[in-house]
Amino acid sequence: MGRRRAPEGGTLGRALIRQQVQRSRSHRHTDSWLHTSELNDGYDWGRLNLQSVTEQSSLDDFLATAELAGTEFVAEKLNIKFVPPEARTGLLSFEENQRIKKLHEENKQFLCIPRRPKWDQKTSPEELKQAEKDNFLEWRRQLVWLEEEQNLILTPFERNLDFWRQLWRVIERSDIVVQIVDARNPLLFRCEDLECYVKTIDDNKENVILINKADLLTAEQRSAWAEFFKKENVKVIFWSALAEAIKLMGNSKGDVNGDTGEAITAEFENSSCDEAEILHKETEHLSLGEAASSEEDESEYEDCQEEEEDWQTCLEDSSSSDEEACGQDCKEGHTVDSEAQGRNTPQKRQIHNFSHLVSKQELLEVFKQLHSGKKVKDGQLTVGLVGYPNVGKSSTINTILGNKKVSVSATPGHTKHFQTLYVEPGLCLCDCPGLVMPSFVSTKAEMICSGILPIDQMRDHVPPVSLVCQNIPRHVLEATYGIDIIKPREDEDPRRPPTSEELLTAYGCMRGFMTAHGQPDQPRSARYILKDYVNGKLLYCHPPPGRDPVTFQYQHQRLLEKKVNGGEIKLQVVRNKKVYQIENVVDKAFFHQENVRALTKGVQAVMGYKPGSGLVTAAAVSSERGAGKPWKKHGNRNKKEKSRRLYKHLDM
């Protein structure tokens, strides 16, 4: 009886044969590993390109246009430029910066704020809302045109219409509109179109710029800014909410050392005595002008302290009738008192700015005596505080009132709705929410360093830290943090500013900020340094137009002179005296010499060399013999180590 066959015994063999045949067939139509090339030296029978092209990429479009124009391109070889990673600073060159400044001056008139559309008693609430939305949309389109067509960078302005509605209400109900700006860069936070809009609503309203954080400026720097705004015919007041709050807190506690807040301004008390007397005379002169104009017609605006729901844009019959009557009274009053206005115009336009820091009482007196025209509400002076977020509007109100009436936060845009507060009978302060108004900037790094954009939400830390390194000299950074920043190479400029990597590496090593791989945590270090820059620990003040930034920051030069002359600079930690410098890789490889060693075999020392132990001195040999342990065979260590493995790096 024969052997029984498997039910599908021949299936595997036929499958392998079939796979081999299919592989040979497919190999004929696929590319092989052999090197082939298309020479295209024969006649092209498919020369007619009948392929339809409806869309092309930018590169294909450029090449097709060049082919139609008959342009030929030749590869440019041996023109290689190596850009190291540390050169990625994200900052503009001098030529690019000058070009952008020129574009800013040419398109300066397009920077405006949205206006409230005109309305009367016949306008319905729906029509007014639709008109406001249309004007706001047109304003948004104009700013988008600036960004796209002119390639300009704008600050992230406010895009919520409700915030602008609150600004309109504050301006309409204020007799004095105060713009609060940062003393380190006043022109960035100043909105010139807001001043024009205030005068458009009512010519009797006054514009004032309150320069907060002025204690960060020296007396010479404040004098320079006061002279600049005097030429611009703008009234400015130098004020520091934090310094005044410390001063008032010390006085209220009755401490013997309660003049700690006064120490900030004690340097300038002697130079500001004459200015205080002139200011007193000016306030008396303005009080006489106010008494002369107190007989003007009274406006019938509603009270400043209203509920939140009364500040909507919807039209109310009572408010509309009052405002229409007020408009008629304004027209009549303008025709009657035109002669008196003409006599007071030269006195109004004459601006006297003083560079000393004002106190709380001086600030209130200036507010009271500044407005000499017709008030919005009879017997009450309303001062509206507007400006960018995080410039100190709420802090100013808390300092003036003496207690915390408005919540304060380091986060920009903390105030969500306006508030009206009475300082005393007849004086009302109105705190407007912080509005980021459109302004020109060069880079987004400038917005981060100015406090406009939050530091904790930044994505790239290199450009803002590079801007800090450009503004703050090397010796100031080293003296502030007690660090030693690595020096430039010998072939580099020794006076160049440090890069962001050099600063963050030194700061991270000093603070112990390390990543999981043992490297300095540069993003974390960048957040600390940028917050110190925004808070004023690393101080840089922008000069007025036309002034040299280096000479304007003369305190940096004084610190360098003290360091050169051997003056004491108090550091936070003990500094290492060793100066680290960036090593030159080419020089290190050129001057590097390998160690010369003698190769021996056996366990006996030859010419002073012992296998595995290197050079052996006579003292070591005598001490080894005197130990009395001849059975110890220490010479067997690394005795059989092959030399070709130890010195394989010397082979070609």
Curated annotation (Swiss-Prot):
<keyword id="KW-0378">Hydrolase</keyword>
<keyword id="KW-0342">GTP-binding</keyword>
<feature type="compositionally biased region" description="Basic residues">
    <location>
        <begin position="630"/>
        <end position="652"/>
    </location>
</feature>
<keyword id="KW-0256">Endoplasmic reticulum</keyword>
<dbReference type="GO" id="GO:0005829">
    <property type="term" value="C:cytosol"/>
</dbReference>
<feature type="binding site">
    <location>
        <begin position="431"/>
        <end position="434"/>
    </location>
    <ligand>
        <name>GTP</name>
    </ligand>
</feature>
<keyword id="KW-0653">Protein transport</keyword>
<feature type="domain" description="CP-type G">
    <location>
        <begin position="164"/>
        <end position="438"/>
    </location>
</feature>
<keyword id="KW-0547">Nucleotide-binding</keyword>
<feature type="modified residue" description="Phosphoserine">
    <location>
        <position position="252"/>
    </location>
</feature>
<dbReference type="InterPro" id="IPR043358">
    <property type="entry name" value="GNL1-like"/>
</dbReference>
<protein>
    <recommendedName>
        <fullName>Large subunit GTPase 1 homolog</fullName>
        <ecNumber>3.6.5.-</ecNumber>
    </recommendedName>
</protein>
<dbReference type="GO" id="GO:0051168">
    <property type="term" value="P:nuclear export"/>
</dbReference>
<keyword id="KW-0813">Transport</keyword>
<keyword id="KW-0963">Cytoplasm</keyword>
<comment type="function">
    <text>Functions as a GTPase. May act by mediating the release of NMD3 from the 60S ribosomal subunit after export into the cytoplasm during the 60S ribosomal subunit maturation.</text>
</comment>
<feature type="region of interest" description="Disordered">
    <location>
        <begin position="288"/>
        <end position="347"/>
    </location>
</feature>
<dbReference type="InterPro" id="IPR027417">
    <property type="entry name" value="P-loop_NTPase"/>
</dbReference>
<feature type="region of interest" description="Disordered">
    <location>
        <begin position="625"/>
        <end position="652"/>
    </location>
</feature>
<dbReference type="GO" id="GO:0015030">
    <property type="term" value="C:Cajal body"/>
</dbReference>
<dbReference type="GO" id="GO:0005525">
    <property type="term" value="F:GTP binding"/>
</dbReference>
<dbReference type="InterPro" id="IPR030378">
    <property type="entry name" value="G_CP_dom"/>
</dbReference>
<dbReference type="Pfam" id="PF01926">
    <property type="entry name" value="MMR_HSR1"/>
</dbReference>
<comment type="similarity">
    <text>Belongs to the TRAFAC class YlqF/YawG GTPase family. LSG1 subfamily.</text>
</comment>
<feature type="compositionally biased region" description="Acidic residues">
    <location>
        <begin position="293"/>
        <end position="311"/>
    </location>
</feature>
<dbReference type="GO" id="GO:0003924">
    <property type="term" value="F:GTPase activity"/>
</dbReference>
<dbReference type="GO" id="GO:0005783">
    <property type="term" value="C:endoplasmic reticulum"/>
</dbReference>
<feature type="binding site">
    <location>
        <begin position="212"/>
        <end position="215"/>
    </location>
    <ligand>
        <name>GTP</name>
    </ligand>
</feature>
<keyword id="KW-0539">Nucleus</keyword>
<feature type="binding site">
    <location>
        <begin position="387"/>
        <end position="394"/>
    </location>
    <ligand>
        <name>GTP</name>
    </ligand>
</feature>
<feature type="modified residue" description="Phosphoserine">
    <location>
        <position position="93"/>
    </location>
</feature>
<keyword id="KW-0597">Phosphoprotein</keyword>
<dbReference type="GO" id="GO:0000054">
    <property type="term" value="P:ribosomal subunit export from nucleus"/>
</dbReference>
<dbReference type="InterPro" id="IPR006073">
    <property type="entry name" value="GTP-bd"/>
</dbReference>
<dbReference type="GO" id="GO:0015031">
    <property type="term" value="P:protein transport"/>
</dbReference>
